[in-house]
Amino acid sequence: TVTVTYDPSNAPSFQQEIANAAQIWNSSVRNVQLRAGGNADFSYYEGNDSRGSYAQTDGHGRGYIFLDYQQNQQYDSTRVTAHETGHVLGLPDHYQGPCSELMSGGGPGPSCTNPYPNAQERSRVNALWANG
């Protein structure tokens, strides 16, 4: 199992959502685990951006996640955070997917509050991290 370390300190408004997203992913996949700490592989930031929230990542644990204030008021914040974290773990967007699919993101609309990856998403992450 690979441990990927994240730094939540630059997103003080989203500490609970970040912790929840990490817990969701940690309970959903076995080949990679997330933990908060120093010398981090990736970091969370917060602020205002007309593009909304996004992940700038290599798709294998490195980079950063930006959490947009306005989008997180409109959409379920734990879902947004878990979705962006999914990018750091290697998953692409799939906006046309249903609410049950985490990587459908904002596609199903603000009424969708599901923060959990589905079976296909979980197995994809496990496969991507099978060899470290």
Curated annotation (Swiss-Prot):
Main location: secreted
Active-site residues from the entry: E84
UniProt-listed GO biological process terms: proteolysis
Family matches, as Gene3D superfamilies: Collagenase (Catalytic Domain)
Keywords: Calcium, Disulfide bond, Hydrolase, Metal-binding, Metalloprotease, Protease, Secreted, Zinc
Reactions catalysed according to its record: Hydrolyzes proteins with a preference for Tyr or Phe in the P1' position. Has no action on amino-acid p-nitroanilides
Functional note: Specifically hydrolyzes the peptide bond at the imino side of aromatic residues.
Disulfide partners: C99-C112
Family affiliation: Belongs to the peptidase M7 family.
Molecular functions per Gene Ontology: metalloendopeptidase activity; zinc ion binding
Cofactor note: Binds 1 Ca(2+) ion per subunit. Binds 1 zinc ion per subunit.
InterPro entries cross-referenced by the UniProt entry: MetalloPept_cat_dom_sf, Peptidase_M7
GO annotations of cellular component type: extracellular region
A Pfam match: Peptidase_M7
Location within or outside the cell: Secreted
Protein residues bound to Zn(2+): H83, H87, D93
Protein's UniProt keywords contain Disulfide bond: yes
Protein name: Extracellular small neutral protease
EC number(s) per entry: 3.4.24.77
Co-factor(s): Ca(2+); Zn(2+)
Binding site for Ca(2+): D76, T78
